[in-house]
Amino acid sequence: MLKIKNILTCAISISLFLMSSTAADATQTAEDLRNSDISKLVKQSKFDSRDYGIVTPVRDQGDTSLCWAYSTASASETSILRSGIDKSVDKSSLSLSPQQIGYARHNRGSDPLNNTTGEITSSSGNWSYAGGGTKYAAALLSTWCGPVKSDKAYNVNGWSNAAYKLESAISVDGKNLNKDAAAREKMKRAIVKYGAVTFSYNNVREAF
């Protein structure tokens, strides 16, 4: 069983390093990135994790409410490739199941590690439309209930089928990125150091 060094979750109003869905060929390797000086990379005018071959392909969530689970799975994949903890996978072969994350968020049992004591999950209807968030995902993965590989069934036992184990999750405050230079520096450093971040925002819909 391998351990994920870090999965980042953050709530930000503006994405700092925009990444398009167009695939790019890696110009350097993940090993090059691991051997680079983070402080120097942060000061560059541009940083793109795709240049190092650590960004997995874009996936379509369909009409589900699992954007947060897809984001968590993708950030986890990049973190794994960035850290180099699993030499048997690359950006083409590593695929974690967002469906398992979504299902387990609303259908899991007790936490054997007691990392989420007191948390109450209450949802009705189809779990794939029940919603969630990246902080909820970090809480779930802190119990080691997943992540599982995409070739597993979404309702598989997450504890016995976890492909990796989360060691820590880091939250970066991104509320003032467009005004606070120090906040932007911290966000840049997080992206460079861990390869990716997730972010959440609340889109309130009004009917007329």
Write out the residue ranges for each language-model feature.
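Catalytic-core signature of thiol
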Residues: 25-208
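Bacterial N-terminal signal peptides that target proteins for export
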Residues: 1-9
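Bacterial N-terminal signal peptides
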Residues: 10-19
